[in-house]
Every structure is written in C-alpha cells, then in structure tokens.
C-alpha cells in the first residue's frame, strides 16, 4: 500500500497545480521557441482557464473543471483542483493512467503542511511532489532550484516501503489462486508490465523521479481493456509527445496513419468490424 501511494503521488504531481512544498522535479522553461510551435488559435470553445499540456508540455489547453474526468493523458484540472482516483478504488494508479480520475477540490489539509510534519514518510510527502501547472514562460514554470537528492534516511524508508508492498502483493496473489479471473487483454497485460517496471525503479537519483516515467510508454487502454485508437507519449522538454493510431485489439500502428505531435485523427484510418459489416450489407 505504501509503494502504491508513493507512485500515485508521482502521477498526481504530473496532474496537479503547484504547492509551496519542496519540489523534487521541475519542468524545463517554456522558451519563446517552444511556445512558437503551439497552434496559433486558442482552444475552442473558450476556456474558463488555460493550463499547460500534460507532462511538461508548453502549449495551452483547456483545464478540466470540478467533477470532470482526468488522468495522465488528459488536460490538467483547473486551479484549486486536483485529479483524484475514485474513493475506494482498488487500483488508483491504474485508474489515473486510464483517465478514470475525477477533478475535485484539493484535500491537502488532510495531510498537514510539510513544516508541521517534518518527519512524514516519503509516500506521505510525495503528495506534494508537484510539477507547475500554470501557463507561464518565466521562472515560475521551470524554477531555478536543482532537484533535491533524497537523504539516506528517506532512501531507507523507501526501500522498507517497497518491501512491505511486495509482501502485500505476494499475500494477495496467494489468496487469489483459487479465484477464477477473466483473461487479461493485450493492452492490460502491457500496462501491467509497465506498472511492474515502475514499481521496481530506483526512483531517488539526481534526475528526479518523474524523468523515469517520461522514458516509458504507458499503454492507453479503454474501460473494456482495449487499446484506445490514439496512443501518445508524454510531453517532455516543453514539447508535446508524439501521437499515433493503433488497432484497438493488437495495438499495432494503423497503416497509413501519421505519427505527429498533435491529433492524428485516427477515426480516418480505422473502420470498426461493425461498420465494415454494415457497409458490406449496404453494398449492391
């Protein structure tokens, strides 16, 4: 449970607005050159608030409002809000990856300020590992402070937390041996592999923990376990991640579809089996 909260905190950091607590990872500044690559027209319809694209993107997108769905691949929540998994979710980290979170009012007071709780565990403090959410090009976006390297005490606490999480996982596996589970889809299996890699990462180093997440491709699965037509890499170095179109069943790229930093309009390159049968029936 502790490791899950630690990893959940890392993803929450990508999805939320900044907090005054010490930041372990900061996005690079949005230079004029990077901002010049953004689309010229403002998002439509008009937004109540503009925020940076997911990850470390620099282009403006409409912020998600309270009650709207959110996740790793969606736009961020508006100021004063945070993307939370649904209460009681058994897999909160996976829920955020799948975009099944909900924008809600910040609940930082539940944890207390960092000044009042200087001895809190890393998984508790990870709730404040935030990446700037505002659309600005100055130091407020990137910050000038270098990433803080965790102390030996914190590294030991992380190791203990990871071992406890592994023990809990082994215990759950033993209890579920007699239970029949539905077959996992290819997308879900790939997602499980990525989450397993994340759980085994050596997070504390000089690059900052979120750098590791950007190096991975997290499969974008829908609620039924299939691949979403559009798959995207996370934004990095102020640029939007590349997006491409895939077959929902196999996850392989659709022939003729582009790989671009934007919307590849995947509906133009894929015909569902139902649509294909309907077209055949209408043909003379």
Curated annotation (Swiss-Prot):
<dbReference type="GO" id="GO:0005576">
    <property type="term" value="C:extracellular region"/>
</dbReference>
<keyword id="KW-0732">Signal</keyword>
<feature type="disulfide bond">
    <location>
        <begin position="47"/>
        <end position="62"/>
    </location>
</feature>
<keyword id="KW-0217">Developmental protein</keyword>
<feature type="disulfide bond">
    <location>
        <begin position="77"/>
        <end position="103"/>
    </location>
</feature>
<feature type="disulfide bond">
    <location>
        <begin position="232"/>
        <end position="243"/>
    </location>
</feature>
<feature type="disulfide bond">
    <location>
        <begin position="70"/>
        <end position="83"/>
    </location>
</feature>
<protein>
    <recommendedName>
        <fullName>Insulin-like growth factor-binding protein 2</fullName>
    </recommendedName>
</protein>
<dbReference type="InterPro" id="IPR036857">
    <property type="entry name" value="Thyroglobulin_1_sf"/>
</dbReference>
<keyword id="KW-1015">Disulfide bond</keyword>
<dbReference type="InterPro" id="IPR000716">
    <property type="entry name" value="Thyroglobulin_1"/>
</dbReference>
<feature type="signal peptide">
    <location>
        <begin position="1"/>
        <end position="21"/>
    </location>
</feature>
<feature type="compositionally biased region" description="Basic and acidic residues">
    <location>
        <begin position="152"/>
        <end position="180"/>
    </location>
</feature>
<dbReference type="InterPro" id="IPR022321">
    <property type="entry name" value="IGFBP_1-6_chordata"/>
</dbReference>
<dbReference type="InterPro" id="IPR012210">
    <property type="entry name" value="IGFBP-2"/>
</dbReference>
<keyword id="KW-0341">Growth regulation</keyword>
<feature type="disulfide bond">
    <location>
        <begin position="30"/>
        <end position="58"/>
    </location>
</feature>
<feature type="compositionally biased region" description="Low complexity">
    <location>
        <begin position="136"/>
        <end position="145"/>
    </location>
</feature>
<dbReference type="GO" id="GO:0031994">
    <property type="term" value="F:insulin-like growth factor I binding"/>
</dbReference>
<feature type="compositionally biased region" description="Basic and acidic residues">
    <location>
        <begin position="117"/>
        <end position="127"/>
    </location>
</feature>
<dbReference type="InterPro" id="IPR017891">
    <property type="entry name" value="Insulin_GF-bd_Cys-rich_CS"/>
</dbReference>
<feature type="domain" description="IGFBP N-terminal">
    <location>
        <begin position="23"/>
        <end position="106"/>
    </location>
</feature>
<feature type="disulfide bond">
    <location>
        <begin position="38"/>
        <end position="59"/>
    </location>
</feature>
<dbReference type="GO" id="GO:0031995">
    <property type="term" value="F:insulin-like growth factor II binding"/>
</dbReference>
<comment type="function">
    <text>IGF-binding proteins prolong the half-life of the IGFs and have been shown to either inhibit or stimulate the growth promoting effects of the IGFs on cell culture. They alter the interaction of IGFs with their cell surface receptors.</text>
</comment>
<feature type="region of interest" description="Disordered">
    <location>
        <begin position="108"/>
        <end position="184"/>
    </location>
</feature>
<keyword id="KW-0340">Growth factor binding</keyword>
<dbReference type="InterPro" id="IPR000867">
    <property type="entry name" value="IGFBP-like"/>
</dbReference>
<feature type="domain" description="Thyroglobulin type-1">
    <location>
        <begin position="184"/>
        <end position="266"/>
    </location>
</feature>
<feature type="disulfide bond">
    <location>
        <begin position="27"/>
        <end position="56"/>
    </location>
</feature>
<feature type="disulfide bond">
    <location>
        <begin position="187"/>
        <end position="221"/>
    </location>
</feature>
<dbReference type="Pfam" id="PF00086">
    <property type="entry name" value="Thyroglobulin_1"/>
</dbReference>
<dbReference type="Pfam" id="PF00219">
    <property type="entry name" value="IGFBP"/>
</dbReference>
<dbReference type="InterPro" id="IPR009030">
    <property type="entry name" value="Growth_fac_rcpt_cys_sf"/>
</dbReference>
<dbReference type="GO" id="GO:0043567">
    <property type="term" value="P:regulation of insulin-like growth factor receptor signaling pathway"/>
</dbReference>
<comment type="subunit">
    <text>Interacts with igf1 and igf2.</text>
</comment>
<feature type="short sequence motif" description="Cell attachment site">
    <location>
        <begin position="261"/>
        <end position="263"/>
    </location>
</feature>
<feature type="disulfide bond">
    <location>
        <begin position="245"/>
        <end position="266"/>
    </location>
</feature>
<keyword id="KW-0964">Secreted</keyword>
